[in-house]
Amino acid sequence: FIPSLKKADCPSLYAGSNASKPYSSADCIVYRLGETYLISAEIDWRLGNNQSAAERLTTLRNRACKGHDHSMDITAAEVTQEFLLDGYAREMIGEWNRWMTLKRFRAFESRITKANPQITKFDKNIHYLRPIPTAELLLIDNANEYQNPGY
């Protein structure tokens, strides 16, 4: 069994009457309220305001589980980098901004090797940056001065 994810797939909005078309007229999700709560909690955590971060995360959790008791409320002591990264992983699964979140937290190595221990070629001195596209570098005379290390 291999799970799949079709978070933004909307077959009823495929163009034309033929639902086998490879494209859709569904809206593209660019920013979500859940992400706003996570970013706000992250900022509070980085500023040392764990109580405020916990309140934001509890609000986010309440959105997902209406009518729950307070046993799911988050305390200030629970707000850590790992807790926030887990929250981002749950809330933003399958969305494009995961790379930026892991980069911002400098958590590639811990998160990638935790999820996939077979990854051995991760180099923190190289892989936090992406290569500058060759097409861009060909437009300047001193391209070798601008390419990121390791590429």
Language-model-detected regions and their locations in the chain:
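C-terminal substrate/ligand-recognition segments
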Residues: 1-60
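Long, intrinsically disordered, low-complexity segments
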Residues: 2-3, 10, 20-30, 61, ...
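Helix-capping and short linker residues that terminate individual alpha-solenoid repeat units
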Residues: 65-66
